[in-house]
Amino acid sequence: MGFRINTNIGALNAHANSVVNSNELDKSLSRLSSGLRINSAADDASGMAIADSLRSQAATLGQAINNGNDAIGILQTADKAMDEQLKILDTIKTKATQAAQDGQSLKTRTMLQADINRLMEELDNIANTTSFNGKQLLSGNFTNQEFQIGASSNQTIKATIGATQSSKIGVTRFETGAQSFTSGVVGLTIKNYNGIEDFKFDNVVISTSVGTGLGALAEEINKSADKTGVRATYDVKTTGVYAIKEGTTSQDFAINGVVIGQINYKDGDNNGQLVSAINAVKDTTGVQASKDENGKLVLTSADGRGIKITGDIGVGSGILANQKENYGRLSLVKNDGRDINISGTNLSAIGMGTTDMISQSSVSLRESKGQISATNADAMGFNSYKGGGKFVFTQNVSSISAFMSAQGSGFSRGSGFSVGSGKNLSVGLSQGIQIISSAASMSNTYVVSAGSGFSSGSGNSQFAALKTTAANTTDETAGVTTLKGAMAVMDIAETAITNLDQIRADIGSVQNQLQVTINNITVTQVNVKAAESTIRDVDFASESANFSKYNILAQSGSYAMSQANAVQQNVLKLLQ
């Protein structure tokens, strides 16, 4: 080998290796001090890109978890508020049930209604004030609200909370047929009861026999109420149009085929003869007699069979000729507020034929707070003599003395009706006058033209005008202040409870969905962080070994450079 002084190859190699080793030692120290395998892009370019992507995903998933927890907090707030509303509705239904018995007076029912009104106000107060971060939750505006629960955009869960104000819940469908005056076999089908299928009930006979009539039909309908969602009630009641006057029944007077015979009764049935005679056979006829607060005769079917009067009950009873055969009114109730579509055969026998006026209305909880409108009351079946939302007033005059107290009050001399004669005006008229109007009050004069049978000198009468006045037709009183109203409020409160339960069930489902999602993305976040750590974080055991290696190499490199420099001294020996 040659000896050179100008270029120390050994020293250069030792220096070069020392520089490389020093760089590796610096990297090792950097990794050990930071805990990261990748401290710069130069350490691992592709690894850094993957690690950064994983870090971003993990951070986003962390915020998604927070979003989900916020959503759960919102839904829990609404759920607890609705729990209080349900307690209020339970109390409302309890008070309506308390009012739904005739042991209550108008005064006590009015107090119960006042309590119900205050409860409704509190229910609405909860609905209008429950909020989260300034956002109303129960007002109906919290609809299709989205919560980001993924690392990528549009990975959301939607939540909707329905309105819970009294005007939005409890919407109950009431449908009541017209008064039925015909018997027969009825086949009833509810169309699309579940949105798809029809439900056909067994045929029911409408008659005056035991086990027939609207009572039997209502029983048949109610057996399947859980499936169809439709419940039925009935009202088979015949009420006189005026207070009982003195009169006599005929020898062949009978109710539902059971002969009662001749009865002499007094004004107001003060001797109790008429009511007692009818009630003496009530177990056979199924019809019970009573007097209402105005002294009118009331015949009520105990089991929903029809009421048929044959023979002559007497004009003093207040029962008109067209009332002698009565099969009542059928009322249907559906708690979801949707129309009740029916079809079948002989539906006119239950007042629901194509030509009958069927009263229909959907009523919310709030509408039971104030006065119930005439239309709603009719749909609920409040009055046996209403139909199609119209007020039907039928009046035959029982005694002239009740309508004329002196000459010149509407009847002229020679008319055939003297003051106090007791003659029945219906004898002079072939039919009663029927007024159908939705007006608040009625007072009209009906002028009789020539040829009508009431012209002067006709022998029927010598008056040229007939004056009629009917009582005001007002809305029914509020809520539970009547027995029928209390029953209706029970139905409405039950619907409202069902509505809130449905909303709460939806909220619960979304909460569960959110919780499952949070659990899933929490696991995903852990795995993503683990993957990032594998790429980015340093393995201290491995790196410590590397550090020891590079540290020893650094020391040996220094020794090598020292020895390489000493080699040049050997040239001097050649010059000695």
UniProtKB/Swiss-Prot annotation:
Compartment(s): Secreted; Bacterial flagellum
Disruption phenotype: In a double flaA-flaB deletion, cells grow faster and are non-motile, flagellar filaments are non-existent.
Cited InterPro entries: Flagellin, Flagellin_C, Flagellin_C_sub2, Flagellin_hook_IN_motif, Flagellin_N
Keyword Secreted: yes
Gene Ontology CC annotation, any one: extracellular region
Keyword field: Bacterial flagellum, Secreted
GO function terms (MF aspect): structural molecule activity
UniProt entry tagged with the keyword Secreted: yes
Subunit structure: Heteromer of FlaA and FlaB. Interacts with FliW. Interacts with FliS.
Family label: Belongs to the bacterial flagellin family.
Protein task: Flagellin is the subunit protein which polymerizes to form the filaments of bacterial flagella.
Protein name: Flagellin B
Organism: Campylobacter jejuni subsp. jejuni serotype O:6 (strain 81116 / NCTC 11828)
Origin organism lineage: Bacteria, Pseudomonadati, Campylobacterota, Epsilonproteobacteria, Campylobacterales
Gene encoding the protein: flaB
